[in-house]
Structures are given as C-alpha cells and as structure tokens.
Amino acid sequence: MAILCTTTSPAEKEHEPKQDLEKDQTSPLIFNPSLLNLQSQIPNQFIWPDEEKPSIDIPELNVPFIDLSSQDSTLEAPRVIAEACTKHGFFLVVNHGVSESLIADAHRLMESFFDMPLAGKQKAQRKPGESCGYASSFTGRFSTKLPWKETLSFQFSNDNSGSRTVQDYFSDTLGQEFEQFGKVYQDYCEAMSSLSLKIMELLGLSLGVNRDYFRGFFEENDSIMRLNHYPPCQTPDLTLGTGPHCDPSSLTILHQDHVNGLQVFVDNQWQSIRPNPKAFVVNIGDTFMALSNGIFKSCLHRAVVNRESARKSMAFFLCPKKDKVVKPPSDILEKMKTRKYPDFTWSMFLEFTQKHYRADVNTLDSFSNWVITNNNPI
C-alpha cells in the first residue's frame, strides 16, 4: 500500500513481493523474553537494518479527537475525520460508550496470559498459514527482521446467529479454566464491533455517501482480535516491536496501556501517538482504502520497544465477511470515474498476506497486481 509515502518510506527498500512466506524458516528460533533478557546482546534475527532502526527523539503526531457523545458529532466529526483520513488515516475516539471495567478486565487478563510460562501459551500456537493463535515474534514464519513481541490472535464473527466464537475458542484451545478469558474477550469483541459500526456511519458521511452504507457492509463481519506484548529489550535501538506496515484489514481500533510505542509515518518522518486510557486509537486499513477508492489512506506505522517497561495493547481489526466483494460504492465511482483497485474478497486478501507477502507499505498495490496478473476469480 504505497499511496501516502511511496518514495521515502524506510520499509519500501525491504518489501518482499511474491515470496512464499511459509518457506522462510531457515533459522527457527524460540522467542522467550525471560531468557533472552539474560543475554547481553539480542540474536541477530532481531536486529533491523540501519535505515529502519528507531529514532531517539521524534515529534508527537497531532491526532484529532472525535467525541462520540457530542450532539454535534454527526455535523463536525465527518469533516474532521475526512481531513485526518485523507492525510494519514488516524484519529482518536472518546466518550465511546465502552465500559471502563470491561477494558480494565481485558487488560488484566491479557497481562495474565502473557505472564504464563511459554509452554502454557504455546497450547494456542498459531499454525503455518493461519492468522490466529499464539505467535512468538513470528519465529518459524520469518527468519530476519523479527519483531520483539509476542501476540495472541483470535477470530470474531458477528453474524447475528448468537454464536460465541471467542468464548468457544478459549475453552476449546486452552481449556475450561480459561472460561473467564472467553467471556471477557467475547464481550470486548462485541463492544468493538458495535463501536466499529458507529465509526462506519461517520466514515460514510465523511465520504459523502449514505451513513448506513458502510454500516450495512460491515454489519456482519469476520474480524480479528489481537493481544500484543512487547517485553523490555536490552538494546531497543537495534530492533522494533512491530515493523513498518499498513494494516490489511478495514479498520483498526487500538487500546494502549500507559507505555509509549506507537509511531506513524507522516510528512516524511516518524511521529508518535501518546497513550490515552480514555481513548481508542482508530486507523484506516488497506481494505477500507480500497472501499474508498483511495480517498482515505492506510498509513505506515510501527511499534518501538524500550529498555525499562513492557508495553501491551489490544487491537480489534474490523474485516468484512470473507466472501463479501470489496468495491467502492457507486456514489464514489460516479464522482471519480476510474477504479484504483480491482474487486476482491477479504478471504483473498487475507490469504495473500498470510502465505505470499509480508505486510508493508506496498501491500495493497502488490495485492492488486497479484489479483490482476493471476486473474483470480471472486
């Protein structure tokens, strides 16, 4: 996805088109923070190229706040969102209606999970080619530029069937003793899905289409929830918690803990977004960029680590139903006349990023070329 910063992005020099990522397993390595931190130097697999290593001092990004409780939100918010999303795709939402106690419980259980011994976490080990499960620095999937993190990802389906996919995942994968985890994260994902639909109404108004259009498009969704843990690192200037990338999904809703780490590439420089416990960080993903025909930007971002404190965050990736055809609404196409991206389904894009391509600044463009070149049927 190379729309916002194609010529100056540090990630562009290392993007890996048309590579079978499942075969990149030449130097398997176990990421165990408690053991790695006893070493004076981090393994070479975690050291990033000089041009991609984190900067010491960077400015703070001026991110607009969207107050969802304000009666004027449907009047002023679309203009503010449009301004942010045509430039970098990031904004904050406050007074969002999500229970503070639910957020606190989700953070508490996330900390409890990552504090478990490695063997316990590996019961949920992600399988090759899949997007969900426990992943320790993507070891086994990649062999270079490994991120200094561990994650737990799981699917959420909002299909009006009353299914409890998240709750079932924890019980089936980790055992009945994780029933409370399943209940909390099921409720959290449902809250994130509802919040996403509210934001979709504002995005529709921002783009000049019916406010119900995108809400209806995502009413049923096959989304992904991810818990992120970035342990302290003895040499944080050599590595990254998450490398530069654009999210392939449609919309990301992120809640950070109190530790700085999120950085966005805007105006040819990295800028940070300060943690705010009262706010969710929202950003546009590649799929919604395609839905807007390139009007709204999916922006390059990354996560850095530090020597003193662990950082944790929770990311909800809103995605359409896997068989839903992604194409801009007619209102947008009538104004722009030309299509920037081919029709595709989320299942096609997800497979591309899991099996053929390591997400970076060029993901959407590379995927579009892949679809056209291979004449992939929808």
From Swiss-Prot:
Residue intervals passing through the bilayer: none
Region of interest (Disordered), ranges: 1-26
Regions of compositional bias (Basic and acidic residues) in chain numbering: 11-25
Enzyme Commission number(s) of this protein: 1.14.11.-
PROSITE patterns: FE2OG_OXY
Binding site for Fe cation: 245, 247, 301
Biased composition (Polar residues): 1-10
Pathway annotation: Plant hormone biosynthesis; gibberellin biosynthesis
Protein known as: Gibberellin 20 oxidase 2
Protein source organism: Arabidopsis thaliana (Mouse-ear cress)
